[in-house]
């Protein structure tokens, strides 16, 4: 049935709409402000940064979500950003910066933003770098030295034999899994090994004889395997703060395992200077 919209009916409907708008707008605005509130009282201890300057893997957002959902395991609030400006504005309020596959940061971050990260780390901030966070970083000398190496090539998503460094057997990020174990991930080859660098401690290596270390794409481009000494997770305690890197984190499936969760949760707590979750 079609009813003609008379002037009086139109005024009535308009008045009703204005009343509804007046009463609902403050609530909606307040909810939005609360959702995006970045005041110190509403910030957590961990900032997951997922900005990228080069290739951006489609699973980066899913990984940020996965990391945010580790808050209960971590016993720490986790915030997420991909805005480089946040590294200047709010980084100093956090204990840990997680670099979620942040490729080629020199192309993404300006000098002021890079300096903010350097000063924050020198003052004791902890950095946890995942997988592609060591891709194309050589133009940022400070970060390249902090990480110890850069990207060369990688494998397909394959099962491989992972070996725990004997000196690291009790470290909370790798403990409880014996001297070696099988694990499936995308394994990265670096342009050098960090073994023996002062201040670095290798936690895990991958046995290249247990998988094909260079996938076909990179074989055609001259990609090289690392050989017998292929670190895949390590620490660096040089420079004031703590640094942790792991090759895991190409996508969620490489982390959504008991070991993957332990590895990342304990890495973040270690970077924050906190005791392992197993400690009372």
Regions found by a protein language model. Name each.
Residues 24-32:
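Boundary at the C-terminal end of the N-terminal hydrophobic targeting segment
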Residues 45-49, 91-137, 240:
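Short alpha-beta junction capping motif
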Residues 31-94, 276:
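Aromatic-Pro/Gly-enriched surface loop or interdomain linker
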Residues 1-8:
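N-terminal secretory signal peptides that target proteins for export/translocation
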Residues 52-55, 84-87, 102-107, 127, ...:
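Solvent-exposed loop/turn segments at secondary-structure junctions
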Residues 32-44, 69, 73, 92, ...:
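Extracellular ligand-binding/catalytic regions of CAZymes and related secreted enzymes
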Residues 149, 154-239:
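Catalytic beta-strand/loop cores that center a nucleophilic Ser/Cys/Thr
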Residues 11-25:
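Bacterial N-terminal signal peptides
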């Amino acid at each position: 049935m079609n009813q003609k919209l008379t002037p009086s009916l139109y005024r009535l409907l308009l008045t009703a709409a204005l009343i509804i708008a007046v009463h609902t707008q403050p609530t909606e605005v307040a909810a939005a402000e609360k959702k995006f509130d970045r005041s110190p009282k509403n910030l957590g201890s961990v900032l997951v940064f997922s900005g990228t300057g080069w290739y951006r893997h489609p699973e980066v957002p899913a990984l940020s979500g996965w990391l945010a959902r580790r808050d209960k395991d971590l016993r720490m609030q986790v915030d997420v950003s991909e805005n480089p400006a946040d590294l200047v504005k709010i980084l100093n309020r956090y204990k840990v910066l997680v670099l979620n596959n942040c490729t080629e940061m020199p192309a993404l971050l300006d000098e002021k933003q890079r300096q903010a990260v350097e000063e924050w780390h020198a003052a004791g901030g902890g950095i946890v770098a995942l997988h592609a966070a060591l891709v194309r970083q050589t133009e940022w000398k400070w970060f390249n030295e902090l990480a110890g190496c850069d990207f060369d090539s990688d494998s397909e998503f394959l099962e491989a034999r992972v070996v725990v460094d004997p000196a690291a057997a009790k470290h909370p990020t790798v403990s409880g899994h014996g001297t070696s174990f099988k694990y499936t991930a995308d394994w990265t080859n670096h342009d050098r090994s960090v073994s023996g660098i002062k201040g670095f401690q290798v936690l895990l290596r991958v046995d290249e004889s247990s998988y094909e270390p260079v996938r076909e794409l990179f074989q055609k481009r001259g990609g090289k395997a690392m050989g017998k000494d292929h670190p895949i997770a390590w620490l660096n305690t040089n420079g004031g703060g703590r640094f942790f890197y792991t090759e895991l984190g190409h996508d969620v499936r490489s982390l959504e395992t008991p070991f993957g969760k332990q590895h990342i949760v304990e890495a973040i707590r270690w970077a924050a200077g906190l005791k392992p979750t197993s400690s009372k």
